[in-house]
């Protein structure tokens, strides 16, 4: 537990120190956020707020992992697992950076082309699956919350490699893009992720995956430090650079700890946000009417009169409740 706390503390401090250095730089480079004209009118004042701020806490997290790695008498076993989580997070961060760069520099409103983003995400997810099974010897089993059951080929459900590969790709892409969708209000994605990642760090420790917990702890510390600049009124946005990295890292941790199903509970806020978009699109195509005033769901609550801070704090609270519920699902496991 101590290495996890050290990683979180170092990432928090590095992020806190980097903020006043990087934010003015992003301003000078004119990496400003473009705000949707069809969104809540109060968001128009956010136009020009620097984006791509995810580089701040990603650097902080990476620095923290390096510090823990070189601590005298530090944890050595399982470092490849932690490195894999960090690599997936940084890989998605690079994709997000390229997407943000295309938006703010090349003035492409949607960033990278859809097929470019999809290809990059799939390649990273496949690399994760291959490494987890053939290098880490993870197997194709997964944990079932509240049951104490490890579902495995031949025991209860024969997943097999190809099914596992498909599930992994889906989990990684769904999680990364769900966190990306949630990043629509000041502090919403960073705070919600921090709660979920802390829960998965606990799962990792229970599963004796200390290095996975260390990397998650570093990301949590980085996000908490980032909130000092990202909570309302935000001085910087994480952009796709940050949100895709966080989702990628969280999904990688879930895959390595065999707790993909726990994502449905612990990451419930991300699931709900994504479902609100899917429901809105399908219902509108079928009926020509909308279920929500706007999707994702956080914008709906804004448009019914909630303040931005109230929406964010409410979603954080829901995320905390779901995280506790998910951890309760560990009963009988480990």
From Swiss-Prot:
Pathway field: Cell wall biogenesis; peptidoglycan biosynthesis
- Protein location: Cell membrane
Q: Which residues cross the membrane?
A: 2-22, 55-75, 78-98, 116-136, 154-174, 187-207, 211-231, 236-256, 262-282, 311-331
Q: Please indicate which superkingdom the organism of origin belongs to.
A: Bacteria
* EC supergroup of this enzyme: transferase
Transmembrane helix listed as a keyword: yes
Tell me what topology the record assigns in the membrane. Answer: Multi-pass membrane protein
Sorted alphabetically, the keyword list is:
Cell cycle, Cell division, Cell membrane, Cell shape, Cell wall biogenesis/degradation, Magnesium, Membrane, Metal-binding, Peptidoglycan synthesis, Transferase, Transmembrane, Transmembrane helix
List all disulphide bridges recorded for this chain: none
Reactions listed under catalytic activity:
UDP-N-acetyl-alpha-D-muramoyl-L-alanyl-gamma-D-glutamyl-meso-2,6-diaminopimeloyl-D-alanyl-D-alanine + di-trans,octa-cis-undecaprenyl phosphate = di-trans,octa-cis-undecaprenyl diphospho-N-acetyl-alpha-D-muramoyl-L-alanyl-D-glutamyl-meso-2,6-diaminopimeloyl-D-alanyl-D-alanine + UMP
User: What's the Enzyme Commission number for this chain?
Assistant: 2.7.8.13
Q: Which GO terms describe its cellular component?
A: plasma membrane
Q: Which PROSITE patterns match?
A: MRAY_1, MRAY_2
Question: What GO molecular function annotations does the UniProt record carry, in alphabetical order?
Answer: metal ion binding; phospho-N-acetylmuramoyl-pentapeptide-transferase activity; UDP-N-acetylmuramoyl-L-alanyl-D-glutamyl-meso-2,6-diaminopimelyl-D-alanyl-D-alanine:undecaprenyl-phosphate transferase activity
Give the matching Pfam families: Glycos_transf_4 (PF00953), MraY_sig1 (PF10555)
Q: Per the entry, which co-factors are needed?
A: Mg(2+)
State any GO BP term from the record. Answer: peptidoglycan biosynthetic process
UniProt family annotation: Belongs to the glycosyltransferase 4 family. MraY subfamily.
Protein task? Catalyzes the initial step of the lipid cycle reactions in the biosynthesis of the cell wall peptidoglycan: transfers peptidoglycan precursor phospho-MurNAc-pentapeptide from UDP-MurNAc-pentapeptide onto the lipid carrier undecaprenyl phosphate, yielding undecaprenyl-pyrophosphoryl-MurNAc-pentapeptide, known as lipid I.
Q: What is this protein called?
A: Phospho-N-acetylmuramoyl-pentapeptide-transferase
Q: Which gene encodes it?
A: mraY
């Amino acid at each position: 537990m101590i290495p996890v706390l050290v990683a979180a503390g170092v990432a928090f401090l590095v992020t806190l120190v980097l903020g006043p250095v990087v934010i003015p730089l992003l301003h000078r480079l004119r990496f400003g956020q473009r705000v949707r004209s069809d969104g809540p009118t109060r968001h128009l004042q956010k136009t020009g707020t620097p984006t791509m701020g995810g580089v701040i806490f990603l650097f902080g997290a990476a620095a923290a992992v390096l510090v823990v790695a070189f601590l005298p008498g530090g944890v050595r076993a399982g470092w490849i697992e932690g490195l894999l989580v960090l690599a997936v997070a940084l890989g998605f961060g690079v994709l997000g950076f390229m997407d943000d760069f295309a938006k703010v520099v090349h003035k492409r409103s949607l960033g990278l082309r859809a097929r470019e983003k999809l290809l990059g995400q799939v390649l990273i997810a496949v690399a994760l699956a291959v490494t987890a099974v053939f290098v880490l010897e993870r197997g194709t089993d997964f944990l079932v919350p509240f049951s104490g059951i490890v579902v495995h080929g031949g025991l209860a459900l024969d997943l097999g490699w190809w099914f596992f590969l498909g599930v992994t790709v889906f989990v990684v892409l769904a999680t990364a893009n769900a966190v990306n969708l949630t990043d629509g209000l000041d502090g919403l994605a960073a705070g919600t992720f921090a709660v979920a990642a802390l829960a998965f760090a606990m799962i990792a420790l229970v599963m004796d995956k200390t290095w996975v917990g260390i990397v998650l702890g570093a990301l949590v510390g980085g996000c908490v430090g980032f909130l000092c600049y990202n909570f309302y009124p935000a001085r910087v946005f994480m952009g796709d650079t940050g949100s895709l990295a966080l989702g990628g890292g969280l999904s990688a941790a879930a895959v390595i700890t065999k707790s993909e199903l726990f994502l449905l509970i612990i990451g419930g806020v991300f699931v709900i946000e994504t479902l609100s978009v899917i429901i809105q699109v399908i219902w509108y195509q079928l009926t020509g009417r909308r279920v929500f005033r706007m999707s994702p769901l956080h914008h709906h609550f804004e448009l019914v009169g909630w303040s931005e801070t109230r929406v964010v704090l409410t979603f954080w609270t829901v995320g905390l409740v779901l995280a506790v519920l998910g951890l309760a699902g560990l009963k009988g496991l480990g």
